[in-house]
From Swiss-Prot:
Top-level lineage group: Eukaryota
Alphabetical list of Pfam families matching this protein: RabGAP-TBC (PF00566)
Listed Polar residues bias regions: 163-174
Region spans: Disordered: 103-191
Consequence recorded when altering residue 320 to A: Decreased 14-3-3 protein-binding
Compositional bias per record (Low complexity), positions renumbered to this chain: 176-190
Gene from which the chain derives: TBC1D22A
Species of the source: Homo sapiens (Human)
GO molecular function: 14-3-3 protein binding; GTPase activator activity; protein homodimerization activity
Residue numbers bearing the N-acetylalanine modification: 2
Domain Rab-GAP TBC stretches: 222-446
SUPFAM superfamilies: Ypt/Rab-GAP domain of gyp1p
Protein name as catalogued: TBC1 domain family member 22A
A GO cellular component annotation in the UniProt record: Golgi apparatus
InterPro entries registered for this protein in UniProt: Rab-GAP-TBC_dom (IPR000195), Rab-GAP_TBC_sf (IPR035969)
Amino acid sequence: MASDGARKQFWKRSNSKLPGSIQHVYGAQHPPFDPLLHGTLLRSTAKMPTTPVKAKRVSTFQEFESNTSDAWDAGEDDDELLAMAAESLNSEVVMETANRVLRNHSQRQGRPTLQEGPGLQQKPRPEAEPPSPPSGDLRLVKSVSESHTSCPAESASDAAPLQRSQSLPHSATVTLGGTSDPSTLSSSALSEREASRLDKFKQLLAGPNTDLEELRRLSWSGIPKPVRPMTWKLLSGYLPANVDRRPATLQRKQKEYFAFIEHYYDSRNDEVHQDTYRQIHIDIPRMSPEALILQPKVTEIFERILFIWAIRHPASGYVQGINDLVTPFFVVFICEYIEAEEVDTVDVSGVPAEVLCNIEADTYWCMSKLLDGIQDNYTFAQPGIQMKVKMLEELVSRIDEQVHRHLDQHEVRYLQFAFRWMNNLLMREVPLRCTIRLWDTYQSEPDGFSHFHLYVCAAFLVRWRKEILEEKDFQELLLFLQNLPTAHWDDEDISLLLAEAYRLKFAFADAPNHYKK
């Protein structure tokens, strides 16, 4: 009864309104005081001169806490008790009680408590936990207002050790695999992930009937170099999904291509085809990379491929821009037989003639499959490109009106820079290594070269919005858009571009009226 009386007197005293006393107000979304989150703040705050009233409240709170120590066990009253702790203006009492709660909880969970060094301040630091929620509920909830005031740098620094050492204290320094270098760890994890992806591709390609949908899903985020040649041949429709039929199909298609050469190539000097061959002969040395194209064997291969395709497709014939589409296929297929650090410096002098012939045939058929889907880009007046440039203008006006208006104010027309983007599929805008990565995704997308390319171009233009808005002159704007600084781009830049393009496609592809004014 004496204890009950003391408690009643305590509540009576703590609830009595004193003149000039500070009343704490908590909003609907503000949780009870969290000593873990506010320990540093309380410690750094200068203490106010202690008044007799405050000393009395501290003494009373300590008495109450000692009489009700069992209430600090994890239960439904945690929130109420933490709220009472918030009412104390003395940080030492608050932190002492919080430390006791953490020690009790650690003992119940069977985890060792952190030992504080002699030179360290007493500060409770929770142990690193995996992302999954713990079994015990501490009911220490961070409010919306508190999450907004936390420093991003601190959040980032706290997140890194959580991923690096799953169930280890923050103060522990752990060496994994004999090294503690983060770059080594990340590269090791990256190589393991790449090896795992390569195994998935190999298993899929080696099956009796390759699942093309699964192959497209895996290929969207990039194809490992060792399996890229076979994957491209399958995704382009050149080879069948059945493994047993592939050798016969390759042999038949290669023979068919060289039959075309025997039948048509000698007519390149005829008056009817002379202009076509001359234009091809002029355009090939202008292609890039020069180190590859200017090799005599490569020049002859490209001339044959382009001339045969033009003769076999009289509706369009040869149009400037088609020549660029040969390069990615040829480089990918030739890299199956030679090791090259950079695709721009491939040397074919050591490749056997028979292998080069097979690569030439494979390149012709895969390029033909690609052009079958975008042939209206190269027919008379190139209506496919005209339509896509107009669609690009409408799309950009919806997703970034400021960039669109800036181009319009300086009288820059989309045809002046985007025509080449559609005609060459961005091959003149990004390095060849980036084009190959881009085509991994194009071939895994339905109508990737004809439809998805539109959204890639929109994302590509908006990617340079800062630089575009800084240009205040027509000539400078057009010069920038025709010479974009992408020489140092790599796969990561292309992946970001493709991710943004996919977001745009998801928003607009199935609702074309959304980007029509």
